[in-house]
């Protein structure tokens, strides 16, 4: 959800949600041949899975510009890496029904602002790295008498792949789409484990973020009467919001699959300068790579990172305990409580809104909101959200509770920061006294050499003449620069090339105090960075934790002119951040209303799909909790709006430095000073640290795109586009691919589309023949069954197939007749509980003591403790871990009687119609949506002749908060219309 460190926080607080993936590996024979994994065999993880969803951008990015190995040489090598990675993930999960591959398409306007910030930062860093490389080459040549080996020159000068190309509408995304279609068809023809799969490919031409296209599919299938409520889902991706999205489906058999980003295999890490194993950039000597074998064919490469499961079902168990409130005047509903928890997480961070100043996940911001919610739930009379809609009156109660604590939160934060700073200085002084100033002496006590300190960022110096020509070639970085403790962020953020250049520069300034060439006397400054490419929460970025920002001294942090811990902070905040008169209170309330509108948009996006493609939050900063006034009077509604075309999004999010990804006709708009939109593409932009210490945490103050002005400029160039470019600017469709191994579906499609009896060019799938898949398929013009399958790229890295046994058709999701409901479906069988009574009691006792954490480290909880993790106990299948032990359901609140496992009433039948499209200030009552789940009194089973519907029990009082459950069990609306 855009929450920095959210995954780490969740996995630490709720340790049993994590377990390691058991993975079969291909068998390598003595002659070097490989026997692939037989995925037709049972899954070694002890459970079979139906559907696997790949958020493909989480695969494409690490494959195209990896952190732990040399980058692929070209796009074809990248595609081969994507194939290998995808194959590995599919082999782990072994889906038996559906594989969905979703690539990010055009995003809603609300997401474009975040994309714009990331891409501008990325381009700025790439430009600085390129400048560093050019200066490094010049200095290396000077050091080596004007000569550099070909291999060393290639290592330094190779132009890095521009990751901004991984955006809809670029040629790279066309190549990716063609390659993925080929790969899936190839696997359907050649791999028995894939033969019966139905593969849905939603490439970058289909609008929407990848994970949200996946969720739209899950919701569409869930609304079908033929949906199996015990479908087992796995979604792969690196974003923490996948966890929230998994919860929001209310499908209990849901797992998130991801790499264990905490795992660090030091031996496998590669040097960023020379590309060799066994050392990092700080210890690089600049030596040429030693080949393992005549052609380096014996190089074993990098060890594979392990993968981990995140069990949404276990997280639901934890939340059932944590969110339980005893003695409620209405029935506790876990499904609604989980939705409220997701809503509260939105305040701490998401991809569309800045987090509230008082809330940081590292400071237990979610705990703070949860406590307020639990304290007020009985008096609110019901839940804050319903199926993605917000009860604004109840939301006001939560915000008022936070506002009362806001001043103390800021003061407590300052006290904690001061204590940390004091402890740091104390330890630093202790180290200096003890002679432990860090590696190689460290920068904590720089020596004066020849009467001066190192002018480059206070780095330690060596005496003049200390190095001979022989020594110059064997220097390591740590002899000159200690990046991990550098007081300036611009040192810690430097590329490997810039660090090596700084080393050479420092050395040269000592050994040659009077250079002959005047140009050498004042080389350009390095690392004057206003932005960092380190993304929030990206724990895979090296040294992310050590990146600091420019400061007035090594001891002082950046100046904070808002000073949230002092009286008058609100006036200073709006004056400094919004440039508004501190007396303009109505403006503050307007910002609060815009933020509430954003919360309404985000929640609908998570639960129902995109409510508006054009809405966005028009500020860089969030309001204070005290600025949310009278929000219950708001009437929020959204217009669906227009979806941007790919080139329009590219022009919205790309900097001019990445214009190569756009057709040339647009370049002038980004470069010409007379362009009507030149102000959208600043080369330099401010990063506001906003009270933070690390550059990657700062706010990029880029101008917001004025869409009417941009559209007028971009659309004026459309007539100049070539036919190929125009095709890249069009919207595409989802594709369904399957093979003759899926006999019933294969025969039906061939009969209706390609036989003498063929009829209409589209038809509705029969779930009995498609193994449960609902939707409509349409014939692809120009597609001929049983034709040749051609590899689409130039070097023929993969074979052609003379006879393609797969079929490809367009696919449309089924249109639901109602909104997605926050309920468990009839017939669902909940997984075996993972939490024991001791786990539950531990959580409750901590909550009663006001504790913040999940479990003590001294307890044996059966949680995962894989390589690189710091958890309480080693995961063990026999310790009562996920789905293994004889645990129990968490006890219900005191006022309720928990049902036995498998009790009926998990929400029956087709849900009622959607609520209105607008928000109103009338509060929701509790007659609606008291769907059954963990720890609820479900009431008696439906009578045999009763119409299905929500299980309600009680009189459904019209008074707010007094109804004890759902709609009437008679299966009718209040106006007597039957809903089935």
Curated annotation (Swiss-Prot):
Localisation per UniProt entry: Nucleus
One GO BP: rRNA processing
Enzyme class name: hydrolase
Gene3D superfamilies membership: 1.25.40.1050, 3.40.50.12390
Biased amino acid composition, Basic and acidic residues: 413-424, 952-962
Residue stretches in coiled coil: 121-145, 411-435
Catalytic activity, EC: 3.1.13.-
Disulfide bonds: none
Family note: Belongs to the 5'-3' exonuclease family. XRN2/RAT1 subfamily.
UniProt name for this protein: 5'-3' exoribonuclease 2
Organism placement in taxonomy: Eukaryota, Fungi, Dikarya, Ascomycota, Pezizomycotina
